[in-house]
Design a protein with these regions (language model features):
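Short, acidic, small-residue-rich periplasmic hinge/interaction motif at the N-terminus
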Residues: 110-152
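Extracytoplasmic beta-strand/coil segments of soluble accessory domains associated
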Residues: 120-121, 160-201
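Short acidic/polar hinge/loop motifs at secondary-structure boundaries
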Residues: 201-229
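Periplasmic-side early beta-strands and strand-to-turn transitions of outer-membrane beta-barrels
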Residues: 254-255, 263, 275, 279-370
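Face-selective signature of the C-terminal outer-membrane beta-barrel domain
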Residues: 332-346, 376-544, 627-628, 661-664, ...
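Membrane-embedded beta-barrel scaffold of Gram-negative outer-membrane proteins
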Residues: 397-401, 405-407, 566, 601-653, ...
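Gram-negative outer-membrane beta-barrel transporters
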Residues: 524-529, 621-636, 647-731, 834-838
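C-terminal beta-signal and adjacent terminal beta-strands/loops
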Residues: 723-727, 731, 735-736, 757-770, ...
Length: 839
C-alpha cells in the first residue's frame, strides 16, 4: 500500500512538472511570437535596421515554425537595404531549414526570384504536380523536365518533336489528320488523351478534347516544359488521361529586351519569332509572336498503296496551310495579379483523303469555305486572370478563364467519281442522290465553341516539429461550355455544295457544364513523403445525362541525398468528346435510326489505372543523373472510329520499363532515354492483338551537344524506333461486306414469308459471302525499324545568332500510321536556317 502511494505521488509530481513545463514552453513560445511580430511591425513601417537587429539577436532561440518566418523576414530586410549577399545567405539558411519551402504570389518579386534561383541551382523545380513548386525527387509521378537549352539542342521544330525526343513512352503517330503523339501506345485521331497547358491554363478544346502539339505553340517563348508521365485526373480532371504537358513561358526579366528571329528552309518553310520582355518594379511583362508556314514535300503514291485503289498520284506531307500557323500572346504579372492572353491558329493539310480511303487528291480543285481549304483548321483564344493572397496561414488563389475556338474539319472523301464511297458512308438517300455520279466529294464541319470557367484553390503549409511538415491543398472549379453557329456541308464536283436542312445542322448545337472539387495532402516525415489526392467531377452532358467520376492518387516516396524511390497509383478518366457523341447522334438521325427528340448518347468515359515504381539517382557519378521507371497500365473503353461513327471498343493492358539519363561535363551535354513496352491484353473491334498498334515496342533517343568554341555550339539527335504493327479497315471489302449484309437481310425476310429450299440455299450462300468479306475487312501491316539522325549548329557573335538545323540528314525513307488510316510517307531531309538578334 505504501509503495502504491509512493507511485501515485510520483506520478502526480511528474504530472505537475509536465504541466509546468508545458505552460512555461507556451509562455516562451508566446514571448518569441511577440518578438517576431514586433520585428515584422518594424519592417512594415520602414524601421528595417531595428527589425533586422531584433531578429538576429533571437534567431537561435526561435521555435522551428517562427525560425522559418524569421529567415524570410531577414531576407526581406537585406533586400530592402540592397544587401544582396546577406539576403542570399539567409535565403540559403531558409532552404536548409526547409528544402520544400515555396514562395507565394504575395511575396515581393525580388524575394521570389532569389528563392527560385537558389532552388534551381540546387535541383530543378516544377509546379505541374501541385500548386506550389516541387523538386523532381518529391513529385508523386515520374516527371520529365525539358529546359530551354534542351529544346535548342534537340533540333526540334515544334512541341510534338520535343516531346517525342525527351519523354520516355511518347512517340509520333500520323493519323492523316492533325499533328499527334501517343503516350504508352494510347492515342486517337487527334491529340485528345494528353492535357496540354500554357502556364497552367488548359489549351485542349472543350468540344473535341484536342490540343495539337503543333506550330501554334511556339518554342521561343518557353522557359521549360513539365511533363507528368501518367494519369493526372486527381488534379486536372477529365482530360489528363495518359499525361500532362505544362508549357511554362519565360518571364519578362528573362528576356529583358527584344529578341527577333527569322528563318527559311526547303519545302517552302518560313519561320519568324519575336519576344519582348521587361520588368518594371513589381510589373513583369512578356509579349510574344510566332509564325510558321511550309508548302510541304511531295510523294508519289502508286495505286496499290491506296485505300480505294482507284487512282495514283502525288500527296503533300508536312503542308502547313494556305495561311501560316501563328502564336500570339501576352503574360503580365503585377504583385498578386496575373493575366494571360493567347491567340493560336493552326491549319494542317491532310496528305490523303479521309480515314480508311487514304488516296491522293487534287487539293487545288476544291473550293474554300470561308477562306478555308481542305484541312484541319483551328483558331483559339485563351484568357486567364488570377489573384492570390495570404489569408492567415492559407494561401488562396482565384482564377477566371475564357476560351473560344473556331473549329473546322474540311475533309476530302474521294477524288474520282465512284458510288462505292457513297454506299459505304451513312449519308441520307436524298443527299446521296445529289452527289451520285460526281467526282470531288468532300465534307465540311465548322463550329464555334465558347467556355467560361472559375476556380478557387488554397494551400495550407504546416510544420508540427522538425521532422513533420507538409501541405494541404484544396480547390473547386466550374466551367460552362457552349457550341453554336454550327455549319455542316457535303460538297461534290469539287466546288458545289449540297443544301443541308437546318434540322440536321442544328443537331450539332448544345451546351455542357462541369463542376469538380479536389483535395491533396503532401506530408513529409524524415525521409518519407506521403502524397495522396482525390478529385470528384460532376458533368452535365448536353442530353442531361450525368457523369460522376472519382479520381484518386496515392504515392509514397523515400528520399535520400543522392537517390529516391517512389511508388504511385493513379486513376484517370476522360469523357467521350462532345463532337464524337454529337457525330454518333447526327449519323443516327440522318439515317432515321432516331427521331429529332431522341437525345440518346451511347459513348462512355475512357478510364486508365496506372501503377508505377520509380528509382531516380543524382550525381552517383560526377555529372550523371538517371531514372528507371516501371509501369503497368489498364485502359478501358478507349474510343476509336469505325468508318463514320465512334465506339468504346479499345482495351489495353500494358507494362513496360522507361530509362532516362543526362550527363554534363564541361562543354559537353548528353540526354538519352529508352522505352520498352509489352502488351498483356489489347482488344479493338472485338479483335485481339498481341502488341500495340502504330507505336514501337522499343524506342530510344539520344541528344548530344558540344560547345566547340566560345561562339560555336554543335548538336545532334539520334532517334530509334523498332518494328511497328499497323491495323486499319479495308474500305472496299467493307463495302462488299455491307452489300452482302443487306442481301442476307433481304433473303431472311423473304424466307420468313416463303420458306422454300431455293431461298434457304441462297441465304446460306449469301451468309458465307458476308462472312468471307467481313474476314477481309481488317488489314494488318508492319513498319520496319529505323534510325533517324538530325544535326544542328548555333554560332553566336555578340547579340547576333545564326542557327542551322537539318532533320533526317540521311534522307531516310519511312512511313508512319495511326488509327483509321494506312501507311503515310514521312518527311525526308528538311533544313531550316535562322538568324536572330537581341536588342
Amino acid at each position: 500500500m505504501k509503495r502504491c502511494c509512493l507511485v501515485i505521488l510520483s506520478l502526480f509530481n511528474f504530472f505537475i512538472a509536465a504541466m509546468f513545463m508545458a505552460a512555461s514552453a507556451q509562455t516562451t513560445s508566446e514571448q518569441y511570437r511577440d518578438i517576431y511580430e514586433n520585428a515584422e511591425q518594424d519592417y512594415s513601417i520602414g524601421r528595417i535596421e531595428d527589425a533586422q537587429a531584433t531578429l538576429k539577436s533571437h534567431l537561435k532561440n526561435f521555435p522551428v515554425n517562427l525560425r522559418l518566418s524569421a529567415y524570410r523576414m531577414l531576407v526581406l530586410c537585406a533586400l530592402g537595404l540592397d544587401n544582396d549577399q546577406e539576403a542570399e545567405y539567409y535565403a540559403q539558411q531558409l532552404l536548409d531549414e526547409n528544402p520544400y519551402y515555396s514562395t507565394t504570389a504575395s511575396d515581393p518579386q525580388r524575394f521570389i526570384d532569389m528563392i527560385e534561383s537558389i532552388k534551381s541551382g540546387r535541383t530543378a523545380t516544377i509546379t505541374t504536380t501541385s500548386s506550389v513548386a516541387e523538386t523532381l525527387s518529391e513529385v508523386p509521378v515520374p516527371t520529365t523536365l525539358i529546359t530551354e537549352e534542351m529544346i535548342r539542342n534537340s533540333c526540334a521544330r515544334n512541341l510534338q518533336e520535343v516531346l517525342a525526343t525527351y519523354v520516355p513512352g511518347m512517340s509520333i503517330v500520323d493519323c492523316n489528320d492533325d499533328i499527334n503523339v501517343a503516350m504508352r501506345g494510347i492515342y486517337s485521331n487527334g491529340q485528345e488523351k494528353i492535357l496540354i497547358m500554357l502556364n497552367g491554363h488548359r489549351l485542349n478544346s472543350f468540344a473535341t478534347n484536342i490540343a495539337a502539339p503543333d506550330f501554334s505553340i511556339s518554342l521561343e517563348k518557353v522557359k521549360q516544359i513539365e511533363v507528368l508521365r501518367g494519369p493526372a485526373s486527381s488534379l486536372y480532371g477529365g482530360v489528363a488521361l495518359t499525361a500532362v504537358v505544362n508549357v511554362i513561358t519565360k518571364q519578362g526579366i528573362d528576356v529583358d529586351g527584344i529578341t527577333v528571329r527569322a528563318g527559311a528552309g526547303n519545302y517552302g518553310q518560313i519561320k519568324a519569332d519575336m519576344l519582348f520582355g521587361k520588368r518594371y518594379f513589381d510589373l513583369d511583362m512578356l509579349v510574344w509572336g510566332s509564325l510558321y508556314r511550309a508548302k510541304g514535300q511531295k510523294f508519289y503514291i502508286p495505286l496499290e498503296e491506296t485505300g480505294m485503289q482507284m487512282t495514283d498520284g502525288d500527296i503533300t506531307v508536312g503542308g502547313i496551310g494556305e495561311k501560316p500557323s501563328y502564336d500570339l500572346g501576352m503574360q503580365m504579372k503585377y504583385k498578386n495579379l496575373q493575366f494571360l492572353y493567347n491567340v493560336q491558329f493552326s491549319q494542317v493539310i491532310s496528305p490523303f483523303t479521309m480515314s480508311y480511303t487514304f488516296s491522293p487528291y487534287t487539293f487545288d480543285k476544291y473550293t474554300t469555305y470561308n477562306g478555308v481549304p481542305p484541312s484541319f483548321t483551328t483558331r483559339s483564344n485563351h484568357a486567364n486572370l488570377s489573384y492570390g493572397q495570404m489569408v492567415g496561414n492559407v494561401y488562396l488563389k482565384g482564377t477566371v478563364t475564357y476560351d473560344n475556338s473556331d473549329l473546322t474539319h474540311y475533309q476530302v472523301l474521294n477524288d474520282p467519281e465512284t458510288s462505292v464511297m457513297l454506299d459505304v458512308l451513312p449519308i441520307p438517300t436524298d443527299i446521296k442522290g445529289v452527289m451520285d455520279g460526281y467526282p470531288g466529294i468532300s465534307r465540311y464541319v465548322n463550329g464555334q465553341e465558347h467556355t467560361i470557367g472559375g476556380k478557387v484553390q488554397g494551400d495550407w503549409t504546416y510544420i508540427n516539429n522538425g521532422t513533420h511538415q507538409g501541405q494541404l491543398s484544396f480547390g473547386g472549379e466550374y466551367s460552362y461550355f457552349n457550341l453554336d453557329d454550327v455549319e455542316y456541308n457535303f460538297g461534290y464536283d469539287f466546288n458545289q455544295r449540297v443544301i443541308i436542312p437546318d434540322s440536321i445542322i442544328s443537331q450539332g448545337q448544345g451546351h455542357e457544364s462541369n463542376m469538380n472539387g479536389y483535395v491533396q495532402l503532401k506530408h513529409h516525415w524524415r525521409s518519407f513523403i506521403l502524397n495522396a489526392g482525390l478529385r470528384f467531377d460532376y458533368k452535365n452532358r448536353y442530353d442531361d445525362t450525368k457523369i460522376r467520376e472519382f479520381s484518386p492518387r496515392l504515392a509514397l516516396i523515400y528520399l535520400q541525398p543522392k537517390w529516391n524511390l517512389k511508388f504511385s497509383y493513379s486513376k484517370a478518366f476522360i469523357d467521350a468528346p462532345y463532337l464524337y457523341r454529337k457525330t454518333n447522334r447526327l449519323v443516327a438521325f440522318m439515317m432515321n435510326l432516331i427521331n429529332k427528340d431522341d437525345e440518346s448518347d451511347i459513348l462512355n468515359p475512357e478510364t486508365l489505372h496506372s501503377f508505377q515504381l520509380t528509382l531516380a539517382a543524382n550525381q552517383w557519378l560526377p555529372g550523371l543523373n538517371f531514372e528507371v521507371n516501371g509501369f503497368y497500365n489498364r485502359a478501358h473503353d478507349i474510343i476509336y472510329q469505325y468508318v463514320a461513327q465512334h465506339y468504346n471498343t479499345g482495351t489495353y493492358h500494358t507494362y513496360g520499363v522507361e530509362l532516362s539519363a543526362d550527363y554534363e561535363h564541361r562543354r559537353f551535354t548528353a540526354h538519352a532515354n529508352a522505352t520498352w513496352q509489352g502488351v498483356s491484353k489489347a482488344e479493338l473491334f472485338n479483335l485481339n492483338f498481341g502488341h500495340s498498334l502504330s507505336t514501337p515496342d522499343l524506342a530510344a533517343n539520344a541528344v548530344i551537344a558540344w560547345k566547340a568554341t566560345k561562339n560555336l555550339k554543335l548538336r545532334t539527335h539520334a532517334d530509334f524506333k523498332s518494328r511497328q504493327h499497323v491495323f486499319y479497315l479495308d474500305i472496299i471489302n467493307y463495302g462488299v461486306y455491307r452489300m452482302w449484309g443487306q442481301k442476307v437481310q433481304e433473303l431472311k425476310e423473304m424466307y420468313e414469308e416463303n420458306p422454300i429450299p431455293e431461298i434457304k440455299e441462297a441465304l446460306e450462300e449469301a451468309t458465307r459471302y458476308e462472312a468471307d468479306a467481313e474476314a477481309q475487312v481488317p488489314v494488318y501491316k508492319e513498319i520496319d525499324s529505323r534510325v533517324l539522325f538530325d544535326l544542328g549548329a548555333t554560332w553566336q557573335w555578340r547579340n547576333l545568332t545564326f542557327d542551322i538545323d537539318v532533320k533526317n540528314i540521311f534522307n531516310k525513307q519511312y512511313t508512319q500510321s495511326g488509327v483509321s488510316t494506312g501507311l503515310i510517307p514521312q518527311r525526308g531531309r528538311w533544313f531550316l536556317l535562322q538568324l536572330g538578334y537581341k536588342f
